[in-house]
UniProtKB/Swiss-Prot annotation:
Domain called 4Fe-4S ferredoxin-type: residue spans: 369-397, 407-436
Gene: rsxC
HAMAP family with a match to the protein in the record: RsxC_RnfC (MF_00461)
Name of the featured protein: Ion-translocating oxidoreductase complex subunit C
EC category name: translocase
Length: 740
């Protein structure tokens, strides 16, 4: 009695909350043995057929490949893919793949040559002599992934289990309607499946090995029991049919009574699960030396005249498989990859078969019924009762629809296994799984963006820290260089100090004069003369700098005078050759005369302030005075020949004459009161005298040509002329005295 009770406890099974019992529809395809499908003409092999990054390409367009030859390299979590047959690589380009949106992914396109030649195969029949690491590496490099639907790399999963796995579970439940791939594989290849299970057990060394299978597969159960008749290390557990008992968390709870923690993995509780198809692929990779190039696919549905399970090469177009099964599409025919609850509709039939493709369902219009219109949620809680993960689908629906990502995360949307039980029982025909998939994808995108932002922030902070360290190091180097001079600098400083000390010693050395000898003062005298010369040079340099800033260069002055003379000659020639009707405007001539007088005064001031050694030649000054008188006479002639209507106003001329007389008196007073040592410059006096005579003549000419009714008093004009002549004579006498 105790033994019976112990046996009952040993084979105990648990039941999970929720679940549904939809029509199984498995008899359409599980009654015929596995069969081969003729090779397609073209194969499309996506580089990514698993969870993780795609591998690195190791083939090029035009390469000849054999069946089983790697097309990519598997490093880390990157799983390689292999050629499904022999042929030629014709293209490497994006192609639509097995995805609800038919996303394009990079794929290798191979045209088959029809020979189907294998690469040399090296099987490990003695796998028990191999180490755990060698077996895991072989499984990984041969491209084995989870064939139950997740597509997680098997080698990575085994490596992560380590030594903490106590229970190895083989998932043979295959609970979704229509799918019979695992059922037929266990019926036809039970021995190979068990051999693969033993290889996994050899790697993990678990305490117990459990095979969970639903009771709706009697033929498969019989075949497994026959193979395990003489084995005590593997236990076969038959469980009630209930959807979704094939889920990883649900089957773990059914067989062990343990629940996977929220956000955790089954390995956290000492459990590792593998699919039946994965165990078979492990056997072929290790013992037969064959990479995964094909898998069992169920072809079913009322639109298929020849349903069943076939060995489909990876990369085979779906259209090719359906045509081989005598596909009879209707007007609005749909094809579902996967089961009716967890699968997705293909947008077109050129999508290739991949490692996670377990079923192609082509139902008729009567089989699935008319599509129902989505209605509003009535909060009946039927979805919550059917959820096997103990979630609240109606709340998740509202959060997903309202883009409330934080609340959806708080309500554990990540624990949803997308089994479709909630959508199956929903009376409002709401496609809840579609909302949940979209919400999970958006949350994943947000987290990925946050991760990238955090990485960018970390890189920025690291860069700032590096720049600060470099700046501190640079300042430290500069500080060290300033405090501690280099060896060259030290030598130069020492040499300079030595020279200074030597000079000081020579300067302080006493001079000894012997009797009868004269002291030698030549060195002292030379040093004194050198200092004086240096002082004079500095003073001269300073004086030249000041003169350059205030006084014009005498040579420049001479050049300007020559330019002025050239301009005067040019003007005379132009006037001499001018036509009578183009006489010079008297006002313009007066302006030019004033400009000439201003230039003459400027030149006189510059010459008067020049250094004594740079005095202008008196003869040159006399020549310039003569030029000025000639210009004055010329201006008088121009004014005399001017048109009568443009004559100067006599009153204005009288005013100018009075101003000239006042200036003459002022000049006489300045000359009379001047100190002898400050005599007027003879050149300046000569120029002023010439200017005065020119003004006098100009006034006489203006008065002579004035209109009769506006004539100035002749006596007054005569007096002014006499005064001007007297001033000129006085200036000439003063010039003679200064020259003496």
């Amino acid at each position: 009695m105790l033994k019976l009770f112990s046996a009952f406890r040993k084979n105990k099974i648990w039941d999970f909350n929720g679940g549904i019992h939809p029509p199984e529809m498995k008899t359409q395809s599980n009654g015929t043995p596995l069969r081969q499908v003729p090779l397609a003409q073209r194969f499309v092999i996506p580089l990514k057929q698993h969870i993780g990054a795609e591998g690195e390409l190791c083939v090029s367009v035009g390469d000849k490949v054999l069946r089983g030859q790697p097309l990519t390299r598997g490093r880390g979590k990157m799983l390689p893919v292999h050629a499904p047959t022999s042929g030629t690589v014709t293209a490497i380009a994006p192609h639509s793949t097995a995805h609800p949106s038919a996303l394009a992914e990079l794929s290798v396109i191979i045209d088959a040559d029809g020979e189907d030649c294998w690469i040399p195969r090296d099987g490990w029949a003695d796998y028990r002599t191999r180490s755990r690491e060698e077996l895991i590496e072989r499984i990984h490099q041969f491209g084995v992934a989870g064939l139950g639907g997740a597509g997680f790399p098997t080698g990575v999963k085994l490596q992560g289990g380590g030594d903490k796995i106590e229970t190895l579970i083989i998932n043979a439940a295959e609970c979704e309607p229509y799918i019979t791939a695992d059922d037929r594989l266990m019926q036809d290849c039970a021995a190979q499946v068990v051999e693969g299970i033993r290889i996994l057990a050899h790697i993990l060394q678990p305490r117990e090995i459990l095979i969970g299978i639903e009771d709706n597969k009697p033929q498969a159960i019989s075949m497994l029991r026959a193979v395990l008749a003489d084995s005590n290390d593997i236990s076969l557990r038959v469980i009630p049919t209930k959807y979704p008992s094939g889920g990883a968390k649900q089957l773990t709870y059914i067989l062990t009574g343990k629940q996977v923690p929220h956000g955790g993995r089954s390995s956290d509780i000492g459990v590792l699960m593998q699919n039946v198809g994965t165990a078979y692929a492990v056997k072929r990779a290790v013992i037969d030396g064959e990479p995964i190039t094909e898998r069992v696919v169920t072809l079913t549905g009322e639109a298929i005249a020849r349903p069943g399970n076939v060995w489909a090469r990876l990369g085979t177009p779906v259209r090719h498989l359906l045509n081989d099964a005598r596909f009879c599409p209707s007007a609005d025919q749909m094809v579902i990859m996967g089961g009716p609850l967890m699968g997705f509709t293909l947008p077109w039939l050129d999508v290739p078969v991949v490692k996670i493709t377990n079923c192609l369902l082509a139902p008729s219009a009567n089989e699935l019924g008319e599509p129902q219109e989505e209605q509003s949620c009535i909060r009946c809680s039927a979805c919550a009762d059917a959820c096997p993960a103990d979630l609240l689908p109606q709340q998740l629906y509202w959060f997903s629809k309202g883009q409330q990502h934080d609340k959806a995360t708080t309500h554990n949307i990540a624990d949803c296994i997308e089994c479709g039980a909630c959508a199956w029982v929903c009376p409002s025909n709401i496609p809840l799984v579609q909302y949940f998939r979209q919400e999970k994808a958006e949350i994943a995108a947000i987290r990925q963006e946050e991760k990238r932002a955090a990485e960018a922030k970390a890189r920025f902070e690291a860069r700032q820290a590096r720049l600060e360290r470099e700046k501190a190091a640079r300042l430290e180097r500069h500080k060290s260089a300033a405090v501690q001079p280099a060896a060259k600098d030290k030598d130069a400083i020492a040499a300079a100090l030595a020279r200074v000390k030597e000079k000081q010693a020579q300067a302080t050395q006493p001079i000894v004069i012997k009797a009868g000898e004269r002291p030698d003062n030549s060195a002292i005298i030379a040093a004194r003369e050198a200092r004086k010369a240096q002082a004079r040079a500095k003073q001269a340099e300073l004086q030249q700098t000041n003169d350059a800033a205030t006084v014009a260069d005498p040579r420049k002055t001479a050049v300007e005078a020559a330019i002025a003379r050239a301009k005067a000659r040019k003007l005379e020639q132009q006037q001499a050759n001018a036509e009578p009707e183009e006489q010079v405007d008297p006002r313009k001539a007066a302006v030019e005369a004033a400009i000439a007088r201003a230039k003459a005064r400027k030149l006189e001031q510059q010459q008067a302030n020049a250094e004594p050694e740079e005095q202008v030649d008196p003869r040159k000054a006399a020549i310039e005075a003569a030029i000025a008188r000639a210009k004055a006479r010329k201006l008088e002639q121009q004014q005399a020949n001017a048109e009568p209507e443009e004559q100067v106003d006599p009153r204005k001329a009288a005013v100018e004459a009075a101003i000239a007389r006042a200036k003459a008196r002022k000049l006489e007073q300045q000359q009379a009161n001047a100190v002898p040592e400050e005599q007027v410059d003879p050149r300046k006096a000569a120029v002023e005298a010439a200017i005065a005579r020119a003004k006098a003549r100009k006034l006489e000419q203006q008065q002579t040509n004035a209109e009769p009714e506006e004539q100035v008093d002749p006596r007054k004009a005569a007096v002014a002329a006499a005064i001007a002549r007297a001033q000129a004579k006085k200036a000439a006498q003063q010039k003679v005295v200064n020259e003496d």
